Amino acid sequence: MAGGPGSYVFGAEEKKELMDVIEAGALFRYGTPGVDGFQGKVATFEKEMAEQLGHKHVVATNAGTSSLMACLAALGIGMGDEVIVPGYTFIASISTIIMMNAIPVLAEIDDSLTIDPDKIEELITPRTKAIVPVHMLGNPCKMDKIMEIAKKHNLAVIEDCCQAVGACYKGKACGTWGDLGAYSLNVFKTITTGDGGFVGCSDETLYERAFGFHDQGHKPSRMGVEVGNRSIVGINMRMNELSGAVALAQTRKLPTILKTLREKKALLKSQLQGLPGVGFRTVNDEGECGTLLTLLFDTKELAAKFCEKAGTSVIARSGWHVYNNMEQILDKKTWTDAHPFHQDERTYAKHMLPVTDDILERAVNISVGVVDKGLGAGTGININSTVDEINQVAANIREIILSL
């Protein structure tokens, strides 16, 4: 079965929350007459997730992509603004910038497979408005360094936490370092509602704007129609009560999920230490999610030989998350030639980020909690794997590496 750890632990808790919604007969967040829209499953999820991560506010959405758009809108990112984002990420981190009529500026990663803070300042121009660090594969970015740069240049920071729900950096939850955090509850994420997401922040104005953008302009106090009292032009990105029910049950399981993943990853990793020609990606903080173990080979040739024998692929060739494979970005395939992204003088091309290319040609993902061929992680273990199963997977990987 493919999916994230949350999809492996569905049980009675999710069923109970779902049946509550079915029996109430109100699937819409505001669907119970006379009941405040902040009393249902979605609202309870927002409250409990905010408490767990340390946000003052959480806004539930229908997708991580929607979460990113709401964050950009809340900050007023728009026509011709430049936003710095790594070249190794899911396409939504880049495409949402374009959707807001802004210009993505692609940045190099380092051997943590997250944005390299030392390469950010050289990309800043008078048009730069924000940085989007992506906590890729559940590994926190170096947020202290990134925040120093942002403060120095008066830039906003949107943390893309879509693959890192519950991760921490230096004791502080990912998503709480910057101005806003965007999170995903997709099936391949740490916890899941199939599709879904949320925005986290603590600033009142940003909260009101993010909420309004995701709910047709309504303010968070929405009760019925608010003619003359809307905060911003928005669209519909709301989460429904069925998704909210699953999100609530999964949120309550998140601490246990993370603890289990970290323990199982540590066991797998301990048996692969000290092998010739290979190490691991740098983990910026042990508060990472533990969803994947990334092998980093000394050479592209060794990585390719390993993949051939293991029946997998290096990250560079896994498909979904590498800028080289995003032809609609590279070729500026916007829905109209009048789009500022299409007209901007900035060009995009394969291999424009040589450091990123080199790292990803040598990197191989082994699943721990996220089983996803799109991440190059179709082989490995999952959250329910036993000690014996983990030992066997480790032995198989060792045998292949030693035979290279």
Over which residues does each language-model region extend?
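N-terminal "arm"/small-domain region of PLP-dependent enzymes with the aminotransferase-like
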Residues: 1-34, 366-368, 372-374
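Phosphate-binding glycine-rich loop
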Residues: 26-35, 39-82, 96-98, 106, ...
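PLP-dependent aminotransferase-like
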Residues: 73-161, 168
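Active-site region of PLP-dependent enzymes
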Residues: 164-170, 177-291
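Short amphipathic alpha-helices in soluble, non-transmembrane regions
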Residues: 210, 304-311, 394-397
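A common structural junction motif
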Residues: 217-218, 310-317, 397-404
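Conserved PLP-binding catalytic core of the aspartate aminotransferase-like
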Residues: 280-351
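PLP-dependent enzyme catalytic core of the Aspartate aminotransferase-like
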Residues: 332-404
